[in-house]
Amino acid sequence: MQSKRPPKAHVKTMLSAKNLEDNEGSNESAAKIPCESPISEARRLNNLKLSKYYPRGSVLFVEGQRPRGVHVLCEGRAKVSIASAQGKTLILRIAQPGDLLGMNATLTGEPYGATVETLERCRIDFIAREDVLKLLDRDKRACLGVAQALSRKLSAVVEHTRLLFLSQSASEKLARLLVRWCDERGKRTALGIRINSDLTHEEMAQMICASRETVTRVLGEFKRKDIVSLSDKAIFVRNRKALESLACC
């Protein structure tokens, strides 16, 4: 039987991932900093993990690759995406500190189902697959933590599916996305609810199955209606009620 080939859009990315494996060295200072995650309290974890810092744009693993283990995101953010053979990309979510990246594939032995790329400098704890399986077999607390993390991930997938397929327009999709970001990581300021985001309009479009031009246009409409204001690294939601009305919340 012919082996599954990764999408063409990821061939170059796979080479980048291999280069990272070959060239990135262990960072001793990273290993000394505590990392909060669903398995952080597990016994003997410090003896199993390999801690590294990765710069922005680093590919941790690629859709279709055989699983080597779990990447625990300790600091920073990363985008989790899938791609078609034609090169169309869909960003499934933005991973946050504490997320277990690649856990599904590590547990099942099936290829990674998505590609993960860092959005900023990240600190990552890597645990090899065989060590993860042994750890979960011996530590009930770690096993429960992973089960809860996977349950939260499933809930997030359901919510993102709702955003993509039950929204009637690009305006509604983008409004839903911004409302969700307000809840997940928004901070109240004098200018409104601040959402830190260094995603490009192209990347935001890849989260809602729209074009870059559409996202730019819709954000412009929101700005003209004084629903949001924009800066280089943040979106300020000035009128949440109006945004929720557009999102049909």
Short names for language-model regions:
Residues 2-59, 100, 105-107:
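Cyclic nucleotide-binding regulatory module and flanking cytosolic helices
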Residues 56, 96-97, 128, 150, ...:
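A secondary-structure boundary/capping signal
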Residues 42, 47, 93-155, 159:
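Cyclic-nucleotide recognition modules
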Residues 177, 181-249:
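Phosphate-/nucleic-acid-contacting segments
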Residues 42, 53, 58-121:
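Cyclic nucleotide-binding regulatory domains
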Residues 141-207:
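Polybasic "coupling" helices that flank or enter modular domains
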Residues 49, 67-68, 195:
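Short loop/turn microsegments at loop-to-beta-strand junctions
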